[in-house]
From Swiss-Prot:
Compartments in which it is found: Endoplasmic reticulum membrane
Organism from which the protein derives: Kluyveromyces lactis (strain ATCC 8585 / CBS 2359 / DSM 70799 / NBRC 1267 / NRRL Y-1140 / WM37)
PANTHER family: GLYCOSYLTRANSFERASE (PTHR22760), GPI MANNOSYLTRANSFERASE 4 (PTHR22760:SF3)
Source lineage: Eukaryota, Fungi, Dikarya, Ascomycota, Saccharomycotina
Glycosites: 435, 500
Pathway: Glycolipid biosynthesis; glycosylphosphatidylinositol-anchor biosynthesis
Protein name, UniProt field: GPI mannosyltransferase 4
Length: 505
């Protein structure tokens, strides 16, 4: 009874966190909403490397299938500004994931007691509240993966009841393989062992099912390639666009991955997995696993993704529901210190939910929303995550950033004469580049605004003899974890500020 209450509270907390302006990683905007919103509305934004026509690494078709319906509804019915639209997408992601989990657990061949406890752990997890509600391609990957495993289990059920898998089930299986792969090239990593199991149980004596699945995969893939090629051809792409292949070839080169960060190959297993599971990692270690499709998918995914040197936590967020469905939780109530584990689990997820879902980089989105659809001067972003420029909703927007020459950062490509509706992303550049940027713009305008987190306020001290910084906008709901200089506790300063900057005459 207590777990059921906590489960429902977890659902409510997830809804509330979905409506918070936290910002986990730039990819939640630049791999999804940035390209689709700017293409739909005609607003200017940031063109990331994945969507450059020279080597397209992301499928536009998948984005259109998933994100266009709400854009259409917003254009014709809701008329929400970008902030409201963002919250609408987060609610869509969260509610869809919650619904899919229910169907997924129904076909996991576990007891009702196990399902109840699995739903409790899934719904009270900060991974569900935060990562699954945000607009990551990883969030959609989890949903597609659960639908895939559900379909696999249904195929096995059909073979047991009527000795063959139906055409519709096999066709859906192939379609999900294709859609999931074109959404994220990492998707097949989770499929290898489950597909071997399905082949053994369903297709070994019924090869027609393999044919149906293969035809479906090929047909859906061909359609996506066709639509992607058409989409990119309008921007000078001259050959067939196979986005997952381009993405895989890019990530096979260590030099390319190094630009995004290299990690030890044990990062997923020893760091990211415990961060996802928290205290219940003890259950997964001590309890016997039910070696069904979810467990096979989990093992397959972690092992395959650990081969690559770039390992972020969000790459393995699908493992949370898989692990919860795989562990034998029927005897959890008699497990040593079960109450302690539940208490520590709830505390862990509330803390992580507050940090990641409420405060993390949470000042950026409200600040941009303040200027959404309006004229503004030069905005210089310094020591923050890259601003999601689609939220400016500005057809006259100019976006500039730094450039590198032999690993040295410069600001050579910034058009200094553009002094209105101009966003300059200085990222984590040093104080000298900030000073140069301010100086160059001051030669053309006296309307310059600087956005920066409170964690680096002390770094402005050398410039205060030359520049006047007047606070125009400020929020305390902003936690910058990237510039905390431990063990100097004074650098832990929540908040984000917008300054009006002018020369001291």
């Amino acid at each position: 009874m207590k777990l059921k209450l906590y489960e429902y509270l977890g659902l409510i907390i997830g809804l509330l966190i979905a409506l918070e302006p936290s910002y986990i990683h730039p990819d939640e905007h630049f791999q999804t909403l940035e390209p689709i919103f700017t293409a739909w509305t005609g607003a200017k934004g940031t063109a990331t490397w994945e969507f450059l026509p020279e080597n397209p690494c992301r499928s536009i078709t998948i984005l259109r299938l998933y994100y266009t319906p709400l854009l259409w509804l917003n254009q014709h019915i809701f008329h929400l500004k970008p902030l409201g639209l963002l919250y609408l997408y987060r609610l869509q992601n969260y509610l869809l994931y919650t619904a899919v989990v229910i169907f997924f657990l129904e076909f996991c061949e576990v007891s009702i007691t196990h399902k109840t406890k699995a739903k409790f752990f899934i719904r009270t997890s900060y991974v569900t509240w935060v990562f699954q509600s945000h607009t990551f391609s990883n969030s959609l990957e989890t949903i597609i993966l659960l639908l895939f495993l559900f379909t696999c289990q249904y195929c096995i059920y059909e073979v047991r009841s009527r000795h063959y898998a139906t055409f519709s089930s096999c066709f859906l299986l192939g379609a999900l393989i294709s859609i999931g792969t074109f959404n994220r090239v990492t998707f097949p990593a989770y499929l290898i062992l489950p597909l071997l199991s399905v082949f053994y149980h369903c297709f070994l004596s019924h090869w027609i099912g393999v044919a149906y699945t293969a035809i479906s995969t090929a047909l859906v893939s061909a359609l996506i390639i066709l639509f992607d090629t058409k989409a990119y051809s309008s921007t000078d792409c001259k050959s067939w666009v196979i986005a997952p292949l381009n993405n895989l070839l890019y990530n096979m080169k260590v030099d390319n991955i190094a630009q995004h960060g290299l990690h030890p190959r044990y990062t997923h297993l020893l760091i990211n997995l415990p961060l996802i599971c928290g205290p219940i990692i003890l259950l997964f270690i001590s309890q016997k696993a039910v070696l069904k499709l979810p467990a096979l998918s989990c093992i397959s995914g972690i092992l395959m993704l650990s081969l690559f040197r770039h390992q972020e936590l969000r790459f393995i967020i699908p493992v949370l529901p898989l692990l919860c469905a795989s562990m034998n939780l029927d005897n959890f109530d008699t497990f040593f210190q079960a109450e302690t584990i539940i208490t520590s689990w709830l505390v862990f997820n509330i803390v992580m939910g507050l940090i990641m879902g409420v405060f993390h980089q949470a000042g950026i989105i409200p600040l941009i929303s303040y200027f959404s659809g309006e004229e503004f001067p030069v905005h210089i972003w310094w020591k923050t995550y890259s601003p999601p420029t689609w939220m400016y909703s500005n057809p006259d927007l100019t976006v500039s950033t730094t450039n590198f020459k032999e690993n040295v950062e410069f600001v050579d490509n910034i058009p200094w004469h553009v002094v209105s509706n101009h966003v300059v992303d200085l990222k984590g550049s040093d104080i000298e580049l900030l000073n140069k940027t301010l100086t160059k713009f001051s030669e053309n305008t006296d309307s310059i605004q600087l956005i920066m987190p409170n964690t680096v306020l002390d770094k402005l001290t050398p410039l205060q003899s030359q520049w006047k910084f007047i606070t125009e906008w400020e929020t305390q709901q902003h936690l910058d974890l990237d510039h905390i200089d431990m063990p100097d506790w004074t650098t832990i300063k929540p908040g984000l500020r917008l300054y009006n900057v002018s020369l001291i005459v």
